[in-house]
Amino acid sequence: MKKILQSSLFLSAVFLGSAQVLESDNYNSYTLGNVSTSMTTAGQGGMNLYNGAIANYQIVAGDAARVKYLAVTGGSDGTTTSSRYVYKTGLATAWAGRTSGNNIIKGSFEVYTGTSTNKHLSGVSIFGADNGIVGIGYNSQTKTINGRAYLAITADPSQDGYYNITGLTANTYPANTWVTLGFSYNKTTGAITYVVAGNALTLSVNGASTVPGFDPAEFDIHSAPTRTSTTDPANSGPTTFGIDNYVIEASNSAVLGTSDIKKEKTSIIAIGPNPTSEYLNILTELKINKAEIFDMSGKKVNSTLEGNQINVKHLNPGSYIINLETSKGKTVEKFIKK
């Protein structure tokens, strides 16, 4: 298992064209309660669990639109051990057996934004054999939708990797709300598209490009702890979120027509690679007024922004927070130093 980070509508109006389902679930056929009886063997529906305890993964009753859904509870602190993952095996085999020409993997799902008090980033990711490819989820600290993407860095290929993406939408979403999200990755062209509540955006990042050629190997539902700012304490209680009605497909069609897709990059900020061992890149067209790094205790560490890079070689391995101020406001992201 590759761990590089720690509306019932299926977007039928957004995802068009011929497609074949590779993996899906609506959880309605499962027994309420624990997803599995073990952290080491697959449970209901072939779901595997990673991190935490059996009780952290539950099938719960929903409403008329969502009869049952998967609820995941994160840990009670801000460390990586509070992260949670749910995954099935079989995506790599299904992708390898797809119909010839169906080189676009795309997914849609509903996320329940969950806990309002503690902080979490919860959603889904598609992983390849060695790295993350694409992901999208809800950030409870900013109440916004954040993306993930593997990017090739124009100025320094050694910094290629899995990046955190903010600025996908200016909309915010409160706690305990269902939001419909989607994504696509084109193996042939490398194009990545995100869909938030029916609105599509093709990813374009200043100083970087998406990468073609990756084969999807695993679909992960995941949650990781975050903090609202560097002065906030780490999570002092559990965090929750939910997932329902997900569909992962292989298709030969792009998401919408090119005239219907928003191609806006002025608000996009990509931070990574995450994890990193030497440099943290900040890729954006926005003017960066300030960049500061803090450890998880809230202590500021020495760092200097040089162009669009921060040298982190001197940092001890572990989790850190980067606090950015741009002309569009503040961005707080967590990253891991290897």
Name what the model sees in each region.
Residues 69-151:
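Secretory/extracellular carbohydrate-interaction modules
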Residues 27, 241-248:
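Extracellular beta-strand elements of beta-rich domains used
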